[in-house]
C-alpha cells in the first residue's frame, strides 16, 4: 500500500528510557552457554548495555512522564493535543485502551481522539501514517504519537536468543500541519502467514496464561523459555529483512524520483548491529548514513528504536533550520515492513530523558 501526504511535519521528538541499566557481561551467568561463545555473540550482535523498567512500571508511566516533561518546558500545551496515538505491544491492560489511561492521568481535554495500535517494530512508521491521516481532518491540528514498550517483562532471563536484546523505552513524537507543500511518501506491506516468527504464544484469548504456560522449557541450545515469554525465530527474521526490506525502499525511492545517494540518513529499526550492517551492505548504503548504535546503549525497544536513533544521533542537526531528507524503515512482528521518505528539521525538541 502506498501513501502520499502533504502540508504536514514532525515538530518534535522526545525519547524516554528507564534509568535502570544492565550489561550483557553481567547477565552472561544466566545463560547455560560457554562464556567464550557469549562474548563472541556480544561482539557480533552489538550487545552491551540496555535499559529496563523496574518491576511494576508500565507503558503509561513512561508516557505520562515524557509528556509532563514537554508540558513543564513549554514545548507542548495540553489543550493543543487533538489526537493521541499509542503504539505498543505491552499495554497496561487489555481494557481500557492505555491511550485513554494516559489521557485521564494527564487531564487532557475530552474533545480529542485516543487510539491504541497493536504493532511491533514497524510501529513508528505505521503510527506516523495514522497521524498524517488524522491531520487530513479539519478539526485535528496537532497529533501526539507515543511509541512505548516494556517487553523486558515478557522475556525469559534464561533465553539467550532474546533476553540480552530487549530494552524498554518510550518516544513521543509531535506531528502537526505545515504551510509548505512538502511531500511525504510511504509504502507498507504485511504478511500474516509468517506471524509466528515473532510472538508471545500465551496470554491472549487463544491461549490464556496458566500455571502450565509459565513452565520453562528447553527450546534448544540450552535456552529456557515459557509460552508466556516473547519468542523470536532469528533466522526467519534475518532472511525476511534481507529479502523484503531493500526492494520496498528501492521501490519507494523510484516512486518519489529520488536516487539513493540523495538520502541524508536511513533511520531504520534496530534489531541488532549485525542485522542492520547486513541490510546496509545489501543496499550499498554507507554505515555513516545508517546509524546503528541504539541496541548497544538501550537495547531493542521495538517501535521506539527509530525515534531513539534520531534523538541519539541527530539532535543538534535537527534543531537547526536546515532540513534533511531521510528514509525511515521499520520491519518485524506481523510480519510487517514499512518505509517513509520525509524531510526532518526545525524540531523544537529532539532529546532523550531518563525515567527515574
Feature annotation, model-predicted:
Residues 22-23, 95-97, 155-159, 337-341:
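Short acidic, glycine/serine/threonine-rich loops at helix termini
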Residues 14, 87, 118, 143-149, ...:
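Short beta-strand segments
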Residues 1-55, 159-239, 243, 247, ...:
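Condensing-enzyme catalytic core mediating Claisen C-C bond formation in acyl metabolism
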Residues 35-42, 93-107, 145-151, 214-221, ...:
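Acidic-glycine-rich active-site phosphate/pyrophosphate-binding loop
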Residues 79-87, 260-269:
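Short glycine-rich phosphate-binding loop at a beta-alpha junction
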Residues 136-170:
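Flexible, glycine-rich active-site loops centered on histidine and acidic residues
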Residues 60, 64, 90-91, 104, ...:
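Claisen-condensing/thiolase-fold acyl-transfer catalytic domains that form or cleave C-C bonds
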Amino acid at each position: 500500500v502506498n501513501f502520499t501526504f502533504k502540508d504536514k511535519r514532525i515538530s518534535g521528538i522526545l525519547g524516554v528510557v528507564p534509568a535502570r541499566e544492565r550489561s550483557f557481561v553481567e547477565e552472561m551467568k544466566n545463560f547455560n552457554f560457554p562464556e567464550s561463545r557469549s562474548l563472541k555473540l556480544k561482539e557480533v550482535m552489538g550487545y552491551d548495555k540496555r535499559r529496563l523498567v523496574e518491576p511494576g512500571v508500565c507503558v503509561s508511566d513512561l508516557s505520562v512522564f515524557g509528556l509532563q516533561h514537554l508540558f513543564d518546558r513549554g514545548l507542548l500545551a495540553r489543550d493543543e493535543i487533538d489526537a493521541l496515538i499509542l503504539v505498543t505491544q505491552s499495554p497496561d491492560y487489555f481494557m481500557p485502551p492505555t491511550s485513554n489511561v494516559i489521557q485521564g492521568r494527564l487531564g487532557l481535554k475530552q474533545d480529542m481522539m485516543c487510539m491504541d495500535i497493536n504493532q511491533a517494530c514497524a510501529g513508528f512508521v505505521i503510527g506516523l501514517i495514522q497521524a498524517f491521516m488524522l491531520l487530513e481532518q479539519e478539526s485535528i491540528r496537532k497529533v501526539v504519537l507515543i511509541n512505548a514498550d516494556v517487553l523486558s517483562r515478557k522475556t525469559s532471563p534464561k533465553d539467550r536468543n532474546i533476553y540480552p536484546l530487549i530494552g524498554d523505552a518510550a518516544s513521543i513524537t509531535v506531528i502537526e500541519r505545515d504551510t509548505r507543500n512538502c511531500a511525504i511518501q510511504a509504502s507498507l506491506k504485511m504478511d500474516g502467514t509468517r506471524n509466528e516468527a515473532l510472538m508471545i504464544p500465551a496470554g491472549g484469548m487463544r491461549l490464556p496464561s496458566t500455571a502450565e504456560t509459565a513452565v520453562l522449557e528447553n527450546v534448544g541450545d540450552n535456552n529456557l523459555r515459557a509460552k508466556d515469554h516473547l519468542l523470536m525465530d532469528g533466522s526467519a527474521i534475518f532472511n525476511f529483512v534481507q529479502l523484503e526490506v531493500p526492494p520496498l525502499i528501492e521501490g519507494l525511492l523510484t516512486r518519489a524520483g529520488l536516487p539513493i545517494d540523495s538520502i541524508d540518513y536511513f533511520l531504520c529499526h534496530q534489531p541488532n548491529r549485525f542485522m542492520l550492517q547486513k541490510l546496509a551492505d545489501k543496499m550499498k548504503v554507507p554505515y555513516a548514513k545508517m546509524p546503528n548504535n541504539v541496541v548497544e546503549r538501550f537495547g531493542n525497544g521495538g517501535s521506539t528504536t527509530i525515534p531513539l536513533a534520531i534523538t541519539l544521533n541527530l539532535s543538534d542537526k535537527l534543531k537547526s533550520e536546515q532540513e534533511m531528507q531521510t528514509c525511515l524503515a521499520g520491519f518485524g512482528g506481523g510480519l510487517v515492513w514499512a518505509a517513509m521518505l520525509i524531510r526532518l528539521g526545525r524540531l523544537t525538541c529532539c532529546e532523550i530523558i531518563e525515567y527515574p
